Amino acid sequence: MQLLCVFCLVLLWEVGAASLSEVKLHLDIEGHASHYTIPWTELMAKVPGLSPEALWREANVTEDLASMLNRYKLIYKTSGTLGIALAEPVDIPAVSEGSMQVDASKVHPGVISGLNSPACMLSAPLEKQLFYYIGTMLPNTRPHSYVFYQLRCHLSYVALSINGDKFQYTGAMTSKFLMGTYKRVTEKGDEHVLSLVFGKTKDLPDLRGPFSYPSLTSAQSGDYSLVIVTTFVHYANFHNYFVPNLKDMFSRAVTMTAASYARYVLQKLVLLEMKGGCREPELDTETLTTMFEVSVAFFKVGHAVGETGNGCVDLRWLAKSFFELTVLKDIIGICYGATVKGMQSYGLERLAAMLMATVKMEELGHLTTEKQEYALRLATVGYPKAGVYSGLIGGATSVLLSAYNRHPLFQPLHTVMRETLFIGSHVVLRELRLNVTTQGPNLALYQLLSTALCSALEIGEVLRGLALGTESGLFSPCYLSLRFDLTRDKLLSMAPQEATLDQAAVSNAVDGFLGRLSLEREDRDAWHLPAYKCVDRLDKVLMIIPLINVTFIISSDREVRGSALYEASTTYLSSSLFLSPVIMNKCSQGAVAGEPRQIPKIQNFTRTQKSCIFCGFALLSYDEKEGLETTTYITSQEVQNSILSSNYFDFDNLHVHYLLLTTNGTVMEIAGLYEERAHVVLAIILYFIAFALGIFLVHKIVMFFL
């Protein structure tokens, strides 16, 4: 239905002054016209605060032609509209037959029975919650007041500032259009403003005379347009450091689905972060373009909901789209201190939390990958309404444990598994950031498994992804692990040495990896581990391995008040390596646990596949020169058998050592064939020396008699 409302103001002139007595309303609904005359007094009663004087001033019908011409000349006009033929995707899928229709304003327990029940949310109540705030969409300030009529309405917005308040960006949006406004205050105090408007052409706001959209539109395709609103002076100023590729910006905004577009923006933010864009944002084209794209990501979700009219929006689509927005909201908050108002539905959050309450978290890892991801997205979206006793950490840990048990040793994560674990990681991040978790053992297991997955090959794969700008650099278990030994030099030694990779890109990737770690350092802190209180100097901690009943703290000094102290004392170890088991979370009474114990060696490691005698133990490998390599947590007989039947132990490398960490706090070195091979090598060397010496003596004797 298309509704066209035209208000005609009838002015009665009395004694040289204008007064408003009535409003004539013309309605044209799908070709059927109706006319109404409403007395002004009745309209004022229905709409209190409506000022005829303000309407008169806003209309500015008495503006002379010279002023209008001057206003027109000030506003920037595009050299021409770029017409592009673009395919617009069908974003929201059709609702399956029999889906339960849920009103966002009337969510109650039992409205949906479980994850397997198809459901959708009614569009109108949902849209109302997403655009709940009332604010000024089109301000009465220049240059906007030259082009638009002032507009206050229901809206949402994304706002951030850089360099104090000297540079601001606000992306204000309704379900119909988005206006992204850049505002910069120069050192001289001059203010420059530029706005980009995106939306369906027919839904863009009305313009003041004498403006028309063709002169302001930069790009157009089918239903959508991208418009620039600024003055020639302001445009010239912004053009010094902001030269966006409007064709690419517009094409992506039109052709990508809401969820995929949000993921694209998230990937851009990670790459910006690699370059130090969070710590010291540069006012350049890339940063400013990304700001606009962040607001487009939020707009596309709200716009898609609004486009369904009085329909119903599939719950799985909502879970996926709002998960992406939640992740995006978190990273721009951490990176730029950005504020997001609106684009949040308490009804959706409540429904997601209720659905998760029907799931047995400890069994989440047994579901199909599709259901795991759906549940974890719901967990993230519903987190604000779930409460601290929801057990969501247990669900994320169950999924990670399932992935770990079937993951090949020392292999980087494959694409599907990386995506699933990325979704689950956000539940963990939420509880870590809020410091409210009641899931200590599950959280410790989650971080232990993440540490075990943070192998050299995994690190190499992530560095490759960061260097090439692919999604494999977006997430790694390393970011939530308990590894604190990853320095720049160490990461460079783990980086892939490929001819196709530019070394400068690899170096930037290493910086980006470290940037991710520093950004998440608070999240990766060990505050929730009971053994945390036994550590006096966190900067000396290299790794933490929390097993059942005992937590091993690996450090570069002896200042850990553990139950015992072991030292990895080998000839070529470039830096000290101490292992401090903290049994039953009890710190030693003294300053440290005493003199280091010698690590006993197992010469013949028993290879058994009949029972899991090593379940609950951990294996830690280290290089005498490079330090810690990786750890493996033995969770099941399958993992144990995989270790024993594979090339896990590289005993040919005499500089790599393997330590077995047990649940009673004992540390043993698995020498395997190391000592035997060393003796063989030594015997061969001695035999060669003896043989050479014999030849030499024979030569001397022969020469003596000659």
UniProtKB/Swiss-Prot annotation:
Residues 704-706 are intravirion. Disulfide bonds join C120-C312, C278-C335, C454-C478, C534-C587, C612-C615. Residues 1-18 form the signal peptide. Belongs to the herpesviridae glycoprotein H family. The heterodimer glycoprotein H-glycoprotein L is required for the fusion of viral and plasma membranes leading to virus entry into the host cell. Following initial binding to host receptor, membrane fusion is mediated by the fusion machinery composed of gB and the heterodimer gH/gL. May also be involved in the fusion between the virion envelope and the outer nuclear membrane during virion morphogenesis. The heterodimer gH/gL targets also host EPHA2 to promote viral entry. HAMAP family: HSV_GH. This is Envelope glycoprotein H. It comes from Epstein-Barr virus (strain B95-8).
